[in-house]
């Protein structure tokens, strides 16, 4: 009985030792859970980040950080107002660059 218990233990150990962890399902992790269509005042913006779609999140994400509160808002990249905001910021940045 002792030899069979040791043999079973060794078989289990060798089986578990060779097994690799493989995720059963892919979880999608986007930064933005809820998006806002509300217009944002350029003067109240501290910064705006644009995160492109990736394997971990299929959506383009635009995150605005407000100056006074430091609040981060996820903006709808498909909204006309947000598209024009991004365009205005890009234009402003291109004027600064030599």
From Swiss-Prot:
The gene is CXCL10. CDD domains: Chemokine_CXC (cd00273). Belongs to the intercrine alpha (chemokine CxC) family. Keywords: Chemotaxis, Citrullination, Cytokine, Disulfide bond, Inflammatory response, Secreted, Signal. Its main location: secreted. One of its GO terms (biological process) is T cell chemotaxis. Disulfide bonds join 30-57, 32-74. It comes from Canis lupus familiaris. Pro-inflammatory cytokine that is involved in a wide variety of processes such as chemotaxis, differentiation, and activation of peripheral immune cells, regulation of cell growth, apoptosis and modulation of angiostatic effects. Plays thereby an important role during viral infections by stimulating the activation and migration of immune cells to the infected sites. It comes from the Eukaryota. One of its GO terms (cellular component) is extracellular space. GO terms for molecular function: chemoattractant activity; chemokine activity; CXCR chemokine receptor binding; CXCR3 chemokine receptor binding; heparin binding. This is C-X-C motif chemokine 10. Gene3D superfamilies: 2.40.50.40. Monomer, dimer, and tetramer. Interacts with CXCR3 (via N-terminus). The modification Citrulline is found at residue 26. It is found in: Secreted. Residues 1-21 form the signal peptide.
């Amino acid at each position: 009985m002792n030899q069979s218990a040791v043999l079973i233990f060794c078989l289990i150990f060798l089986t578990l030792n060779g097994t690799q962890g493989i995720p059963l399902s892919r979880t999608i992790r986007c930064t933005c859970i809820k998006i806002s269509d509300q217009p944002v005042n350029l003067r109240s913006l501290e910064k705006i980040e644009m995160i492109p779609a990736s394997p971990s999140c299929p959506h383009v994400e635009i995150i605005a950080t407000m100056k006074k509160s430091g609040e981060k808002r996820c903006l709808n990249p498909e909204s006309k107002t947000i598209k024009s905001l991004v365009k205005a910021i890009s234009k402003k940045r291109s004027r600064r660059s030599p």
